[in-house]
């Protein structure tokens, strides 16, 4: 069976003032992919993620499979009203995403159970640890039942235990059939989670390979230099 493209980005270029953030990037996201966008700071990872999600204007073409229309989710860092409870943050987010009012309570309960936060549902979001806040962000995304999930550095600034919890949730989402595109500075995380690795340098895609191939001895050019770099192998 041929892979089903959910999202196609063609010839996308993005400029912020004097900075060329993306240069003629083309990328296809297939159903079931878990794509890790990797590269040095300023390589274009976050800009590409936002172009894929339709959050930044670009000069190219973005085509979304009709079956995925309206079923996307983006995990932001600290996307909460901190004075509201975990429960109310989740209900508001699901309502804004278009979940029918009659389904809000059940959907919120299911999402909290999925990420292990049921016992904290009445606690203010500001009282959560960093790892718990990220699990709340994942609950908000999971509750929308997205075909496509976008994550920007989902474990940045988390301690090792919290990172493992978040990674376990993402592995579970992928097993459930969710298609995921994630930017990360952590090559170890990309190797553990992703099915494809896309390496960016200077706003251009320099490599787009299955994970096993990307981390093999066959890798060439700038991508190989990146994987061998001192910072690249600071596996967290």
Regions picked out by a protein language model, each given a short descriptive name:
Residues 53:
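Helix-to-loop junction immediately C-terminal to a conserved catalytic motif
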Residues 124-128, 132:
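Conserved ABC ATPase signature
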Residues 184-185:
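H-loop/switch region of ABC-family ATPase nucleotide-binding domains
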Residues 102-120:
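Conserved ABC ATPase "signature" region
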Residues 149-152:
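Catalytic Walker B motif of ABC-type/P-loop ATPase nucleotide-binding domains
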Residues 160-162:
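Helix N-cap at the start of a conserved alpha-helix in ABC-type nucleotide-binding domains
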Residues 38-40:
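The feature captures the beta-strand-to-loop junction immediately N-terminal to the Walker
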